[in-house]
Each structure stands twice: as structure tokens, then as C-alpha cells.
Design a protein with these regions (language model features):
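A conditional alpha-helix N-cap/helix-loop micro-motif detector
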Residues: 20, 89-93
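A secondary-structure boundary/capping signal
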Residues: 26, 41, 64-65, 82, ...
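A short, well-structured juxtamembrane/interface segment
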Residues: 12-35
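Short, basic, glycine/proline-bearing loop/turn elements
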Residues: 10-13, 80-86, 113-117
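Non-catalytic C-terminal accessory region of glycerolipid acyltransferases
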Residues: 2-5, 9, 94-237
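Catalytic core of membrane glycerolipid acyltransferases/transacylases, capturing the structured
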Residues: 6, 31-90, 98
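Short, well-ordered coil/turn elements that cap or connect secondary structure elements
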Residues: 17-19, 57, 75, 136, ...
Length: 237
């Protein structure tokens, strides 16, 4: 109940405050049931509360840096918003276990492949964790492109600015463990492939390390596979 209320509150605040400036694109691409790894880019504090609010599923969970869970009141709200702690830049076994348990039970996991907020606002090198989880769970990955969130809530700002913000859901795909020739796909290449899919949803100026999309696609041939006719919904969150 608390999660549903917080999501509805976030949607309402966003749509009212950013009236005429906010849009959600591609929500029909989101599988409404079954295990799903949702991977957005991350350049603003606004991203983690916004993404779950507009995913048209109520069974989404998010990884959040463990530092947020040190204070009881903050920890309460993070858990209420379906977030669980992860120790960044490490092989956090507890977080990995929680992730696989959620996916095994058919729920959705939101994780940011870069592993942290990228203050430059452009795509950076991802951590291998997203690729590892996607390969081991063998479930669909949904790329998400966020634009305008950094401008809306810059680092250090006390109040959001009225600026254009968009959430674009791409088409889900699978990350392979082996290429067609039998060579193993590394976790690093798997994570890079996820970032390329995110880059395709962003304007060129936000693509950063993945600006040369076609070159990366060629390098990563056989790392991903499309999903035919994913179970998608027509409605809006």
C-alpha cells in the first residue's frame, strides 16, 4: 500500500510541476509480467524516485547505495519505495542474492549499469554487474533513456527547475552467455551492450562514451538477442 501511494504521489507531483514539459515514451514496450531487468542511465538524484513511478508495474524493486540506509527514517522510506541496499563497486553478495530472488519470483529489478550518478550527464563506462545479472538470470533487459533530469534537479539544488524531462522505454532484449561461434560473452561486454541500447534512446550529446553506436554494435555483435512479441501493455502508468 505504501509503495502504491508513493508511486502515485511521485507521478502526480511530476505531472503537475512539469505540466507541458514531461513525457513518457514507449511504455508499450514494458513487459507487464515476468522477470525483468530495467536499466536506465543515471545523471541526477531525481532518477531513482522517478523511474519506478512511471514503470507500469507494481512489482518493481530498485538497488540503492548502502549509504542511504544508515539513518532509520531514510531507511524506512527507501524500503517503503521498494529499494534495497547495495555496496557500490563491489561484489555485494547479499544484494546479488536479493536480485536473483526477485527475478526468480517473476518481479522486476531496476538497476543503473553505471553504478553511480554520472555528474557530467553523459554515458560512462558501466560496472560489470548489470551484465552479470542479465546473463545469469537469463531474463529480458529493458533499456531506459532519461533526458532532462540533470537539468531539472542539478547537484546541490534545493528545488527542481521547470525544464523538459522525458523517460523513453526501449524494446526489451536478452543478453547472451555465448556468441553464435561459441565464444563466451564477458560480463563487461554484456554491460556495454546494455549501455549501447540505452545510448540509442538518448540524444547524441548525452551518449558520451557510447556516441559511436554503430561501432559499438559491430564490436558487440551476438551479445544480445531480440525478443519476439514481448508481453507488453497498452496503458500508461
Amino acid at each position: 500500500m505504501m509503495y502504491a501511494f508513493l508511486r502515485a504521489l511521485m507521478r502526480t507531483i511530476t505531472r503537475v510541476y512539469l505540466a507541458g514539459l514531461f513525457e513518457v515514451v514507449g511504455v508499450e514496450n514494458v513487459p507487464l509480467t515476468g522477470p525483468l531487468i530495467i536499466c536506465p542511465n543515471h545523471s541526477a538524484t531525481l532518477d531513482p524516485p522517478m523511474v519506478p513511478a512511471f514503470v507500469p508495474r507494481s512489482d518493481t524493486w530498485s538497488m540503492a547505495k548502502s549509504e542511504y540506509f544508515r539513518r532509520p527514517l531514510v531507511r524506512f522510506f527507501f524500503y517503503a519505495y521498494h529499494a534495497f541496499p547495495v555496496v557500490r563497486h563491489s561484489a555485494d553478495r547479499a544484494a546479488l542474492r536479493r536480485s536473483f530472488d526477485l527475478l526468480k519470483s517473476g518481479q522486476a529489478l531496476i538497476m543503473y549499469p553505471e553504478g553511480t550518478r554520472i555528474e557530467s550527464g553523459v554515458l560512462a563506462k558501466p560496472e560489470p554487474g548489470a551484465g552479470f545479472i542479465a546473463q545469469k538470470a537469463a531474463c529480458p533487459v529493458l533499456p531506459v533513456g532519461l533526458t532532462g533530469t540533470r537539468e531539472c534537479l542539478p547537484k546541490g539544488a534545493r528545488w527542481p527547475r521547470r525544464t523538459r524531462v522525458s523517460i523513453t522505454f526501449g524494446k526489451p532484449f536478452l543478453v547472451q552467455q555465448k556468441r553464435a561461434d561459441g565464444t563466451r560473452v564477458s560480463h563487461e561486454d554484456a554491460s556495454d551492450a546494455i549501455m549501447v541500447a540505452i545510448a540509442e534512446l538518448l540524444p547524441l550529446e548525452q551518449r558520451g562514451l557510447f556516441s559511436e553506436v554503430e561501432l559499438h554494435r559491430k564490436r558487440l555483435t551476438g551479445v544480445t538477442a531480440p525478443i519476439a512479441d514481448p508481453p507488453a501493455g497498452e496503458g500508461r502508468a
